[in-house]
Amino acid sequence: MLRPEATATAYREWDERWKTETGRRDWLKPESEVKEIAELLGNIGASAAMDLGCGIGRHSLFLASMGYSVFALDGSNAGVDFARSLAQEQMRPIHFVTGLMTDLPCADESFDYLLAWNVIYHGNRDVVRRSLSEIHRVLRPGGIFQGTMLSKNNHLFGHGREVAADTFVFEGELDKSHPHFYCNQTELAALFDPMELLRVNDLEHEHPGSYHLHFVAMKTHLQDLE
């Protein structure tokens, strides 16, 4: 079995992908669910947002266009560089940082809204828990966390090589050659404690069988995760 820190490595594959126009092509438009929640929160006073795993900046740019003060982080230098160039072209004052989801360079209780779309399942359970602990730390009380996790209904769950509990790699399958963690809705709720899950849907993405858990959660307690 791999050490936790050895499993959060998928950003290396994405770093290569973000260097090419072909690799960036499908990741330029913000998700409709993200737009929905960001607009709703903005209407009730949310102002500080973090785009965790920002990639090439599709959601960071949208959030900035909505008037949010945006802090955007990704492990990929290529992704951050491209996102920063787009923000400069569009004159969006976004603060971009290269870093890891398990060690967020932010003060406690900094954000009203934190987005991690297709991000925090890149690693084993310990990596997920560390990332959630950091997310909980930087959210303000009442802050909203929106994102996705890989569902155990996903057609890839249980295939490939299991490198840790519910964590699989698929040799030669681009970012799937890096560890991916899967869970069901009950396990998701346990991982998120003490955050409160407000919405969970098990939805297919672009390809048949590509189920992901789409969630919205709220920080309701002041204590850190265990």
Go through each PLM region and give its residues.
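A short SAM/SAH-binding and catalytic strip from SAM-dependent methyltransferases
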Residues: Y113-V127
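Class I (Rossmann-like) S-adenosyl-L-methionine-dependent methyltransferase catalytic domain
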Residues: M1-G45, I56-D103, I144-E226
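A short acidic, Gly/Pro-enriched loop at the edge of an enzyme's catalytic core
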Residues: T102-L114
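Conserved S-adenosyl-L-methionine
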Residues: G53
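A short glycine-rich, Lys/Arg-flanked "PGG" loop and its adjoining helix->strand segment in the class I
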Residues: R129-P141
